[in-house]
Amino acid sequence: PAAYFYVADMLYRQFGDDSSIKERYPSMKRWVNHMTETKMKDYILVKDEYGDWCMPPESPELIHSEDPARKTNGEVLSTTVFYSILQLMEKFAQMNGLPADAEEYAALAIKIKDAYNKKFFNPGTAQYDNNTVTANLLSLRLGLVPDGYEDKVFANVVEKTEKDCKGHVSAGVLGIQHLMRGLTEYGGLELAYKIVTNDTYPSWGYMIKKGATTIW
């Protein structure tokens, strides 16, 4: 469902086409209200079934990881993404001339960010939840990290990727969307290059070596 909002915003940013934002705003608002009323508990979105889908398992013989430490908490994923949707809805409301809606979304986003950090952020280690790359990366790129902790959270992304994942792909379908962008934005260019050029498991190069014509 998040694609509904992201695509509308992408069309506007890339082409200046705001028709989707104008025409679809009422249905977007209904969906946000539905999620807030039925899937939120203490400002944490508890609706998530798939998690960071297809996080590379420990070996290519496995379909899914058997190690809980490699799995990102579904509430982390759903809450960070919902927070980013609220930021979009604040912008969409302003574009539609609805300042009251914009204020409502901004206020809700603040409450979610506060509750999220109280539940999942460890200020002593600058880690989110169980310190997966995806948990730290989404919190960072989607704007939930408390001021002053950004570099420390990013350092955890780098350390986890280099140490535990040996410089290989370290996220599933949700985290991977932010991995290359996050590394380049925060100065991890060499690590990004290493990940892209690896040809051992798990990596895109490994897929190519095995004859893949699409991403597994």
PLM feature spans:
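Active-site core of glycosidic bond-cleaving carbohydrate-active enzymes
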Residues: 1-216
